[in-house]
Amino acid sequence: MLPSTIQTLTLFLTSGGVLLSLYVSASLSYLLYSDILLKFSPTEITAPKVPLDCANASNVQAVNRSATKGMTLLLSEPEWTYPRLSCQGSTFQKALLISPHRFGESRGNSAPLIIREPFIACGPKECKHFALTHYAAQPGGYYNGTREDRNKLRHLISVKLGKIPTVENSIFHMAAWSGSACHDGREWTYIGVDGPDSNALIKIKYGEAYTDTYHSYANNILRTQESACNCIGGDCYLMITDGSASGISKCRFLKIREGRIIKEIFPTGRVEHTEECTCGFASNKTIECACRDNSYTAKRPFVKLNVETDTAEIRLMCTETYLDTPRPDDGSITGPCESNGDKGRGGIKGGFVHQRMASKIGRWYSRTMSKTERMGMELYVKYDGDPWTDSDALAPSGVMVSMKEPGWYSFGFEIKDKKCDVPCIGIEMVHDGGKKTWHSAATAIYCLMGSGQLLWDTVTGVDMAL
């Protein structure tokens, strides 16, 4: 039933061959639909047997007042999305390369946009490839400033996954130098941050409408996660942070419903510095995030957010496989799990995605192959356990980008199949032209599929000298 129209619900009641025509208003039909969905099967719902006093109902034409039989309503699937079990597989394989600047000889509307911070988010029917553009294309005359993180020209854009982000293919969602997006099963939520460093502003767009804002709380580069937010039952959770890149930066989570902020969540625990979280569902109850500490440690801050209580806690990952860059030698940090160790200054956003199985859970991570530079990208996995307390090394699972190729930010996302979700990791491969020429990125994508070993790494195929 559509809440925008008045529906006629004809009920054939088997006792005495009674026919009732009920003219149900939009609001009543929607409430009935929602209430039944909460209490019964989403595909076939049997209503309880209750007396129906037709004589006292102003909008019901009574034909026979003896009707008391039950009725069966067939309803469509609920609109909101929920995490499901992952599709079967035991390894990741190379799925897709989006390397826009292989087409850099194109001009005009076919020219590739200059972008950075790409990420992917998926709804029930499509995935979108997002990025932050400098409002410039290659080739072109506006290369100056394309290595800057923040300026007045940057915008959040997207294309359908598999399309090249060119001028003509791209949708410009909003002015932004930091961004996120997610789909709740009904509509897209877009997040953009821009403004001066001392007073930046989060803007929210739901579908085509700009719906809400959130102001800086530490007056020091309010920013978001540069990857997909996460939705369950119509509620979407977004990580934000505000604070020094070389000091304290405490994160928060915003709970957003249909484009409007309905709650702020303040994590407890090890909160000194948390930014650029990559988040996903460990279960229908818990969102987990692997984040970046740019100030104090090469270990990743790891968030557990309970969506039933809307509470979150942060602790450092305990594994001896340190996931940030730069980082010390694996296993070299002594002391308890909360020890920072050395080489904690600086960092990089890391890939993280869940493999939800009936009897166990897999957590897949990515990190650069170089300990000091943004070069190469390797995949790791750990089944079950608790990232807060498990000190064991993560298991290497293959090379996605070799040491000869750039490996910058990485992120996780899930593609929705008909009955299961496909976990994937994306890698930003930056063409670093410095301050004298264009500075942009390709995106490599690896997804869970089949068995065996990860077979092949990715190259961008771009020569900036051409």
Swiss-Prot record:
For this protein, the record's SUPFAM superfamilies field holds: Sialidases (SSF50939)
| Transmembrane segment boundaries | 9-31
Which residues constitute the catalytic centre? 149, 409
Q: Which residues bind Ca(2+)?
A: 293, 324
Q: Which GO terms describe its biological process?
A: carbohydrate metabolic process; viral budding from plasma membrane
Q: Name one GO molecular function term.
A: exo-alpha-sialidase activity
Q: Where is the signal peptide?
A: none
Return any one Pfam family short name: Neur
Q: Where is this region: Hypervariable stalk region?
A: 38-86
Q: Which stretches are Intravirion in the membrane topology?
A: 1-8
List the EC numbers from the record.
3.2.1.18
Which keywords accompany this UniProt record?
Answer: Calcium, Disulfide bond, Glycoprotein, Glycosidase, Host cell membrane, Host membrane, Hydrolase, Membrane, Metal-binding, Signal-anchor, Transmembrane, Transmembrane helix, Virion
Biological role stated in the UniProt entry: Catalyzes the removal of terminal sialic acid residues from viral and cellular glycoconjugates. Cleaves off the terminal sialic acids on the glycosylated HA during virus budding to facilitate virus release. Additionally helps virus spread through the circulation by further removing sialic acids from the cell surface. These cleavages prevent self-aggregation and ensure the efficient spread of the progeny virus from cell to cell. Otherwise, infection would be limited to one round of replication.
Q: What is this protein called?
A: Neuraminidase
Lineage here is: Viruses, Riboviria, Orthornavirae, Negarnaviricota, Polyploviricotina
